[in-house]
Amino acid sequence: DDITHIDFLKDACGIPERICCRYNPGGYFSLGTDIMDNPGDAKYGMTKPQIFEAFKRLKREGVKEFGIHSFLASNTVSNEYYPALASILFNLAVELKENLGVHIGFINLSGGVGIPYTPDKEPNDIFAIGEGVRKAYEEILVPAGMGDVKIFTELGRFMLAPHGHL
């Protein structure tokens, strides 16, 4: 979550060969004219310069496989959120690979795909969301030679809330 955690991790238990860092692009995250959330106010995640520095340091410490994680908005009821987030992280992954020579093994799109809490709201179409992520993957990662990157998700609210659990 924070570049200062690298030294703490190293001192506490050593640096593993596989690690994931959280990215915070800062500013406001919006789709169209709707502001979805304000990652700039979040206390978690590294800025772009910080994540580049962190990956450089971690590579020197022996990390072989990197992951990227980001959480930009909560409970979005929009089929565009996940594909937009995926595009941001896929482009960052390509930049990190090309500039630092690191291997990005996985990207965690986290959560944020929500549910409508009132009957007048349209629910997310998970198939449209998946198709948008697939399209971004094929347009950004595959041409960069990164077609082996795994995608992780955390869709707890989307999967469980309609059944009375959260």
Could you say what each language-model-derived stretch is?
Residues 1-106, 115, 136:
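Active-site-proximal beta-alpha core segment in soluble small-molecule metabolic enzymes
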Residues 74-166:
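C-terminal active-site-proximal or functional interface alpha/beta core segments in diverse enzymes
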